[in-house]
Amino acid sequence: MAEASSFLAQKRYAVVTGANKGLGLEICGQLASQGVTVLLTSRDEKRGLEAIEELKKSGINSENLEYHQLDVTKPASFASLADFIKAKFGKLDILVNNAGISGVIVDYAALMEAIRRRGAEINYDGVMKQTYELAEECLQTNYYGVKRTINALLPLLQFSDSPRIVNVSSDVGLLKKIPGERIREALGDVEKLTEESVDGILDEFLRDFKEGKIAEKGWPTFKSAYSISKAALNSYTRVLARKYPSIIINCVCPGVVKTDINLKMGHLTVEEGAASPVRLALMPLGSPSGLFYTRNEVTPFE
């Protein structure tokens, strides 16, 4: 990766969240293969340590791999992580916010049956269950979890001479996917966007969800919480990029990858999917910030 050579001239340190399997694990492997020391994090310590061993067995240099437990939904998780990074590395150069959940429970057998009926339109309401509790957990992981992680690790990123943050997002969070014009405008007005205004939109979403008014109020109905969590993440990325011009901050849709969150039904391998977040993590100095990428192409937030 020639374009990353100048950035990698010095020893670099990265944190990847939600990294014990799938896309996160592959991102760790690809970064470590470039000589970056990667701190793999996961909710489950046992699975995280097993993931480290898996990377070592694949030929990754063990000197480029570290592990620390992190549950992005638990504020108490972050103090020990930050202390570990400060003591071990003294700084942080790369943060990849990959941890995420779908916010739905899928009836896999019913979905497979629907797919087998060629030509039949799938009734996703019949195969995907959405509840208020799931919606709340989804927002806490996919949006607030990213905020917690960034807030906790920002002081360490500011010790780097070229810090960058990559937020793994999805094109379902593009504004054009949101039916309600008022919601689109609120999340898309970059001049007026603040963290507080984005938080307020999510509070409104949860109230409408609890009252059964998702469709009526113009929210996405397909994987509602997941979609709006990614839309909020995209807006938050734009807010951060304006607030911290010295940090390269972007979000990326890696494509539909064969991972658990996509029921292994994607058309891209994890190797292909991880390539775009890794490319953003290793972008050369002076690269653009505050953008949304669909794989390797810049895509309008709208």
From Swiss-Prot:
> Gene3D superfamilies under this entry?
NAD(P)-binding Rossmann-like Domain
Name any one Pfam family assigned in the record: adh_short_C2
Positions contributing to substrate binding? S170
Enzyme Commission (EC) number: 1.1.1.-
Pathway(s) served:
Secondary metabolite biosynthesis; terpenoid biosynthesis
Q: Which organism is it from?
A: Saponaria officinalis (Common soapwort)
PANTHER family, A to Z: (+)-NEOMENTHOL DEHYDROGENASE, OS02G0640600 PROTEIN
Q: Identify the residues that bind NADP(+).
A: 20-23, 43, 71-72, 98, 226, 230, 257-262
Q: Which GO terms describe its molecular function?
A: oxidoreductase activity; oxidoreductase activity, acting on the CH-OH group of donors, NAD or NADP as acceptor
Any one GO biological process: triterpenoid biosynthetic process
- Please give the GO cellular component terms listed in this UniProt entry: membrane
Would the keyword Nucleotide-binding be found if you checked this record's keyword annotation? no
Q: In which tissues is it expressed?
A: Mainly expressed in flowers and flower buds, to a lesser extent in leaves and, at low levels, in stems and roots.
What is the protein named?
Answer: Short-chain dehydrogenase/reductase 1
